[in-house]
Amino acid sequence: MSLLHQARFFITVNHLRDLPATAVPEVAFAGRSNAGKSTAINILCNQKRLAFSSRTPGRTQHINYFSVAPVKAPDPLAFLVDLPGYGYAEVSGSAKYHWQGLLSDYVQTRQQLAGLILMMDARRPFTDLDCQMVEWFLPTGRPIHVLLTKADKLTNSENAKALRETRKMLQGYAEQLETPVPMTAQLFSSLKRRGIEEAQAVIAGWLNLPEARKAEREPAAANSVPPAVPPASDPAA
């Protein structure tokens, strides 16, 4: 079982000064208000109401932290960070300004941030605001993994095209950097439970969770060559 299943609500933050003063790694989830971010977090953590999604898109304008640790552990091993959804037109100007500042400052300056899970609707990936989020985060030199959500809404050929074009866009961004940074993408569907294990593996690896370390050891053990068995001695010799 993934340790992500043990995630628990930790704190809500509305200003950078209130971010937890911890040294453990964090993985942030970002995306448009209607990209299915909260639903995906719940599915990845095998919980129904860990991350709440407002009935009115754009209402969530703060940062929610979820701790990841075994049930009886005294301290978190890591955090999942649910960032405010962006791009909803009915948010007031002052709220939108605060919201955008909180998002950009967090993703650009948070030293504990190990990677960004960027959620995009598979039917319309890389909107202008999605590109803005990538451009904010790119200079940090940390990895980005795109979840193309709502893949169940598309045909197989449409999904293949969306994934191919998304990877091409990410490659273009990666080529802007002097030092290569992992920028990956996958299809994801909360409804069809598609892509869950793949996404969990990425997150666990970034957070250095025990399950990721175990997965690294298992292929090495499977591919190791057993020691040669010496030939039996001939009793008649």
From Swiss-Prot:
Entry keywords, A to Z: Cell cycle, Cell division, GTP-binding, Magnesium, Metal-binding, Nucleotide-binding, Septation
Compositional bias of kind Pro residues: 227-237
Binding site for Mg(2+): S38, T60
Record region (Disordered): 214-237
Domain EngB-type G: 23-209
Cofactor: Mg(2+)
Domain of life: Bacteria
GO cellular component: a single term: cytosol
GO molecular function term, any single one: metal ion binding
GO biological process: division septum assembly
Function: Necessary for normal cell division and for the maintenance of normal septation.
Family: Belongs to the TRAFAC class TrmE-Era-EngA-EngB-Septin-like GTPase superfamily. EngB GTPase family.
Name of the protein: Probable GTP-binding protein EngB
Organism expressing this protein natively: Cupriavidus taiwanensis (strain DSM 17343 / BCRC 17206 / CCUG 44338 / CIP 107171 / LMG 19424 / R1) (Ralstonia taiwanensis (strain LMG 19424))
